[in-house]
Structure formats: C-alpha cells, structure tokens
Amino acid sequence: MQKIAGKAAASPKKGGAPNLLCVWASAEKPPPELARVTELHSLMPWGSLLRGMLGSDTEMRPGLAELCVPGAEFLITLNLHAWRPPVPEVGDHPEPTPESAMELLAPYYAAAGWTLEEARYFGAEELDALATSWTRRLGSTRDELDVLGITGVIGK
C-alpha cells in the first residue's frame, strides 16, 4: 500500500490520484471511511472474500452494500481454476457458470440489495483490461485463465 500511496501523491499529470484512500480492513467489517462508493470491484477474490461472494458468508455483502450509494455498479471476477481441483474456500459450491450464477447466486445477492444483471466468461482482452498484478500472475501460470465475470447494481 505504501508504494501505491506514494504514486497517488504525485500530481495528476504524473499519474497521481488525489482521491485515493488506502485501507487495511476486512470485507466483513469495512470501515465507514469508505462510504459513498459508486463502483465496487472484487477482482479474483480469495479466502473469506471468495466465500462471501459465493454466498457462504451472509454478513459480508450487506456490509459492503452499506458503503455504496444507491445504484452503485459492481464487478466480480471469479477465477474458475479455484474449482480445478477445488480449494477449501469454494466449499460445496459447484463451479459457477453464467447460467448457474444467475440462477443460484442471484438470490444470495438480492437478499443483500445486490441485483445481478449479467454473468459471462471473460475473454483475453477483458482480462488484460483488469490490469491487476494478481490477474497477470494467475495468467502467467497457465495456458488459459478461465474467469467468470458478474456485473450488476447495488441498492437499485
């Protein structure tokens, strides 16, 4: 976080981000300083964040929703290799597909005020556009990275 904060402190002309807020906290109990979020991304979640995005943790999604303004858009990207073979974080959840996400995950999300609008497999260009070091690292260890993208709105 220190490296990112240093870059953010630069002038906007040099890539600085005057509105960056770095927080070390859990998704289960996010700090109120993060309130008024207009767009929420959970890119390749792991551990408790992955369990929460799969519906195993019923507290996390409402907590995150409280931080968002009504109508905030969200993007969740799931690394499907977590099911090949299954890691403990996925529990008994079957590997999601676009169809099963809309059918099985949508009710979990709706209970917390999240509306799933679309679930689809991401192609190489979309994965590159995520531009995260974790996505690059995952992609470098296999011939093809299979990712399910889920989008929607919170508090609509």
Curated annotation (Swiss-Prot):
Keywords: Antibiotic resistance, Methyltransferase, Transferase. It comes from the Bacteria. One of its GO terms (molecular function) is methyltransferase activity. Its EC number is 2.1.1.-. It holds the Pfam family NpmA. GO terms for biological process: methylation; response to antibiotic. It is an enzyme of class 2 (transferase). Modifies 16S rRNA so making ribosomes resistant to certain aminoglycosides. This is rRNA methyltransferase. The gene is kamC.
